[in-house]
Amino acid sequence: PILLIDHHPDPEIKTDWLFSDINVSSTAELVFHFLEETRLISYLDKESASMLLTGIMADTGSFSHNADRPATYRIVSRLIEMGADKERINTLLFNNFSEKRMRLLGHCLSQKMEIFPSCHSALMWLSKEELKEYDFHHGDTEGFVNYPLSVKGIVFTAFFMEMSNYIKISFRSKGNFAANEFS
């Protein structure tokens, strides 16, 4: 049997059981709820608590989005009480990048970002040649799609990345704009 735990709407994976809630911050938060409901939470050790906190922090951009429910912070508090080190996780997730990754981000923001003020949207793209030029490694562009949301008035962004045999597309939004309607 296959159990799928996910916080995204309408997962495409075929499964026997689906545990889903689009109102939570992250899949990690759902896993925490699942462990509570199945009374397995007492088996959570420091390492497992750290993994769940990492998932919550990654999916919320260190609590900058998808983190408006007090229940999320209660879970974070419990994970910290179990030994998860929030500062260490934050450093590893958000302050641990290579120079080439930072230069790729700079190139993307300065040369490859288009702003469409009348649509409150932004678009970014990178070609496979640019990825090669900046010695791209899997994960180097993680979070790039979020940066245009920092521009005043922008509520939707799309990031296109040309891979060897497909184009990877990421969408993000803020406020009441539902990016998942595009995917």
Which positions does each model-derived feature cover?
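Short alpha-helices
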Residues: 7-75
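N-terminal small/polar loop signature for handling phosphorylated ligands or for N-terminal nucleophile
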Residues: 1
